[in-house]
C-alpha cells in the first residue's frame, strides 16, 4: 500500500532567514515527512520538494536543495525532483517557502492504524532530538520576546547560539523503525 504525506518547513524558515543558514531546513523537512509516514508503518520510497522564492538566489537554493538531498540519502529515499517557483511580487526579498511530499510503502497486513492494539502490548518510547519542524512560532516568541535573546546569543545551557540550536536538524526515526519492524 502506498502512503503519502505533505508538509511544510513552517516558521523555522524565519530562523534560516535571520541567520543566513539554509541547509538544515531542507534536511528537517525530509525527516518530518518521513516521520509522518513511519507512524503508519511505511518506509519512504521517494520525495519531491517545492521551493517558492521571491528573487532567485542560487546560493540559497543550492543550500536548501543540498539539505533536502542529504535528508533523502539518510532516509533511503529517492529525490525525484520538485518545483522551484520564482514569484517576485509575492515573497519579501530574502524569503521563501519550502514544502515536501513523500511517498512510502507498507504491506497491507503491517499498516499501523491502532486497530490491533491489545492489553499487554509493549509501548516503545523514543528520545526526542528536540524541537522538530512544528512549534517554532512559540519557540521564537519565548526565545526572542520573553528571553530577549538574538540568533547570535548563546542559548543558556547549550553552549551554542540560538540560531545553531534552533536550526539543528531534528532526527528521523527511520533507523529505530528499521530495528523494530
Please provide the spans of the model-predicted regions:
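Helix-biased detector of long, well-ordered alpha-helical tracts
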Residues: 1-181
Amino acid at each position: 500500500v502506498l502512503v503519502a504525506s505533505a508538509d511544510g518547513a513552517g516558521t523555522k524558515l524565519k530562523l534560516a532567514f535571520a541567520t543566513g543558514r539554509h541547509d538544515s531546513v531542507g534536511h528537517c523537512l525530509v525527516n518530518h515527512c518521513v516521520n509522518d509516514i513511519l507512524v503508519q508503518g511505511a518506509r519512504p520510497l521517494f520525495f519531491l520538494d517545492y521551493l517558492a522564492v521571491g528573487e532567485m538566489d542560487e546560493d540559497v537554493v543550492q543550500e536548501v536543495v543540498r539539505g533536502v538531498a542529504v535528508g533523502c540519502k539518510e532516509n533511503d529515499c529517492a529525490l525525484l525532483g520538485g518545483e522551484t517557483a520564482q514569484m517576485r511580487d509575492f515573497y519579501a526579498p530574502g524569503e521563501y517557502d519550502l514544502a515536501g511530499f513523500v511517498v512510502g510503502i507498507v504491506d497491507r497486513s503491517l499498516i499501523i492504524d491502532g486497530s490491533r492494539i491489545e492489553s499487554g502490548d509493549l509501548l516503545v518510547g523514543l528520545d526526542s532530538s528536540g524541537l522538530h519542524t512544528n512549534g517554532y512560532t512559540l519557540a521564537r516568541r519565548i526565545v526572542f520576546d520573553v528571553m530577549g535573546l538574538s540568533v547570535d546569543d548563546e542559548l543558556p545551557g547549550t553552549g551554542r547560539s540560538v540560531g545553531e540550536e534552533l536550526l539543528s536538524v531534528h532526527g528521523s526515526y527511520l533507523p529505530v523503525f528499521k530495528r523494530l519492524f
